[in-house]
UniProtKB/Swiss-Prot annotation:
Protein name (Swiss-Prot/TrEMBL): Putative HTH-type transcriptional regulatory protein LS215_1371
Entries under CDD domains matching the protein: HTH_XRE (cd00093)
Record key words, sorted: DNA-binding, Transcription, Transcription regulation
GO MF terms held by the record: DNA binding; DNA-binding transcription factor activity
Domain HTH cro/C1-type: 125-180
InterPro entries: Arc_TR_HTH (IPR020886), Cro/C1-type_HTH (IPR001387), Lambda_DNA-bd_dom_sf (IPR010982)
Pfam families membership: HTH_3
Intrachain S-S bonds: none
Keyword GTP-binding among UniProt keywords: no
PROSITE patterns: HTH_CROC1
DNA-binding region: 136-155
Amino acid sequence: MSKKIINEVIDILEDKKYTYTMIEYPEHNRKSVDIVLNSKEPTLIRVSEDKVTKEEISDLKKIAVSTLTASLVVTNEEEEDIVSVKADNVFAVSPEGFKKVINGEKIFLYRTRGGIFIKIRNYILKHKREEMGYSIGDVAKFLGVSRKAIYDYEKGDSDVSLEVAEKLIDLFGDDIIGDVIWDSIKGKKEVIKEDITEFSPESFKSKLIYKLKENGLNILSLKLTAADLIVKDNENNRYLVTIENKDYNKSMKKFYEAKKLASYTKSELLIIIRTSKMLKECEDLGYKTYEENDIHSLIDEIKGSNGRQS
């Protein structure tokens, strides 16, 4: 984590009087979440001078998509007015771009491998086209694109080039232009199913995933943060599961940081304990704990809790 960029991010948040929480696990290795921003539209933040890894992006995507929020990667590699879309609900911005996001300014340019595009509000496009009496063919001809392209624009399946955006503004006005981050999140359907292809019989986490999936629960596996799994039942109740590791002090730190993540994501934290010493300490601290040889109790807790959470 870059101290210079992290200080910029914190200064921006404190200037706007946002409340936030630092996630300090793992302490000395790469991690996927540095800051949890508590706001109307809560956000996960990863600060990096280096290129973020696939594992970091994967964690950010899973948490963001499962909670219908945003993950922001703040890095000096990005331009001020352009967002890079890294994955569903994961966006990379410069420190200047982050300040615009926090100030509520619209960022409408984004970059993918296919080029630079402008975010449009598909529902406004369709409404204005129908209100003004234009057919899909009329708009396609005016823009110089196919009818299929207009269908894709109106369904939200495709955004537009700068050239097409200018013509759309001429035709329908600039309120047709959207915000890359918040309009993208609102348009995403929640996805929590994941194929766990790597199964190691020696790994307790792999065995746990297998048992949870066998009992009809939806699982997302995390690698570089304090929670090990996101679990959802059929009633959409959400849990974060954290597994004790070999080091006592690191485990206590892990549980504390996982509690912050659970609070942010409005999830229930469930801790799996592997030693008797840790079991007593965690119970004294009020954590909901399960022993590693009693996973059925954890499954019964999750499957029996339908309707308890909002």
